[in-house]
Amino acid sequence: MLAKPFMWIILICTATVLASCTGVGRHSEQGFIYKDIQIDTTSASTGQGSTIQFKGNPLPLSGMSIQVGDKLRSVNLAKGDLSLIDVTDTGGSVRLINVVPSLDTTVCEQQTHYLSEKNQGLDQQIKLITISVDTPFAQDRFAKGAEINNVKFLSDFRGGAFGKTHGLLLEGPHVLARAVLVVDGHNVVRHLQVTPDLGHMPDMEKAFQVARSLVNEKG
């Protein structure tokens, strides 16, 4: 059993990191209201020894590093019905994988809405996936409340295996770093961006561009 002071440190760290996205965004009759959130165009490294910033403080990443050209690694994630699926199960499709700390936060919410609503028809050609450590039940509530039907939600709540296997797990708060990956039909990572600052958006348009180029290659 963890000592009480250590448990409190983890709880405080988790609350602090999730505050990086501070408060869930608003919706109107016209749909989701996008906020002016800074977009990072560079990428942090993944894996043990790498860090990302939050309010000027470094947060260490854990796990095995992954980079463009590597293959996505086999790990089981939970679907909405709690059944498991291997993240490498591509079905031969190009996939855009949206990785967020928690859907119950503004930046994460906006990042996922952007994936769903701004992909300009890519959802008809590739698979859109969002991975977080939220429980499958929380992901399902989010998807229904946000009326997002074109994104598959997968949960890494069972110990953060996806994060550890791909160097995207934040050690202290035990949430995933903010990232976007484009993976081809052979499970090769063709694009990877990890936001250097946890409170910033990734460059989703760049990810869309890479995914579209892979679709054109197949065509």
Could you tell me what each predicted segment is?
Residues I85-L115:
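Short active-site neighborhood of thiol/selenol oxidoreductases, capturing the structured segment around
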